[in-house]
Regions:
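...captures the hydrophobic TM-helix bundle architecture rather than a specific catalytic motif
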Residues: 1-283
Length: 283
């Protein structure tokens, strides 16, 4: 009897493989609730509810905390547990590529809305929506000079794309010093872009509720600005990981930095389209 059990157990052994069987994690469900709080807080804040600000802050803090703890586990799986094998890295790359594809569709909706409004402008006359052919932007809107702050921001992002590429090449050459320097410059350029965007918003001659042009403008550039902030945080994490030697001393590659670079180049390309169509052609 005991020999049969031993035989069955031996025959039922799982063969070794290169795939990572993820252990149960609380972070997906927790970040779902955190995002619910974040979106609810943003809605309450935009409708001027008294406690909306506090709910929004709680949502932001919850999302950041969950992401930090989740990414910490992912880094541990790759660096310490060596779970990021070649097939796992290939799957992660496919996942990141699909994520960026969804982001392209996301911004494509804003561009479609902007083109629809600009190619067939409408306005309100005596309380009735009427077509105002050829008048775009609306006469009540004072647009930004595309060769002022927007042009400076374009140069900033193009330069940051060069520095993040420099960091990538430095990593490939195992040059930790140049990688850290290039990442630091990229982070500073990202922060500078965000500050310039905030300055532009502060001095804007129109607000979010001033018609279809204003709402399209703030939605498109605002979400892009949010992506720049997220990308900057992504690169800050990579900066400190590079200083710790996680990339240059890791046989499993540098997926974290690779994905941050993909994301940053995506942000650069989106801005070029925004600058061309919203700032230059939309003036």
């Amino acid at each position: 009897m005991s020999q049969e059990i031993i035989s069955i157990n031996q025959n039922s052994k799982i063969k070794p493989h290169l795939f990572h069987l993820v252990e149960p994690s609380p972070w997906p469900i927790l970040i779902s609730f955190a995002l619910l709080v974040l979106v609810s807080g943003a809605t309450l804040f935009m409708h001027d509810y008294r406690f909306g600000t506090y709910v929004l802050i709680c949502g932001v803090v919850s999302v950041v905390l969950c992401l930090y703890l989740w990414w910490r586990d992912v880094i541990k799986e790759g660096i310490i547990e060596k779970q990021h094998t070649t097939p796992v890295r290939a799957g992660l790359r496919i996942g990141m590529a699909l994520f960026i594809l969804t982001e392209i569709v996301f911004f494509g909706v804003f561009f479609a809305s902007f083109f629809k409004a600009s190619l067939s402008p409408v306005g309100i006359l005596d309380g009735v929506w009427v077509v105002t052919e050829g008048i775009w932007p609306p006469l009540s809107i004072k647009t930004f000079d595309p060769f002022d702050i927007p042009f400076i921001n374009t140069l900033i992002l193009l330069l940051s794309g060069s520095t993040v590429t420099w960091a990538h090449y430095a990593l490939e050459e195992k040059n930790q010093k140049d990688c850290i320097t290039a990442l630091g410059l990229t982070v500073l350029l990202g922060i500078f872009f965000t500050l310039m965007q905030a300055y532009e918003y502060h001095h804007a001659a129109f607000n979010f509720t001033d018609g279809i042009y204003a709402s399209n403008f703030y939605l498109a550039t605002g979400f892009h600005g949010a992506h720049v902030i997220i990308g900057t945080i992504f690169l800050i994490v990579c900066y400190f990981r590079a200083k710790r030697g996680d990339f240059t001393n890791n046989d499993n590659g540098h997926l974290g930095f690779e994905f941050a670079a993909w994301y940053w180049h995506f942000v650069d390309v989106v801005w070029l389209f925004l600058y061309t169509f919203v700032y230059v052609l939309g003036k």
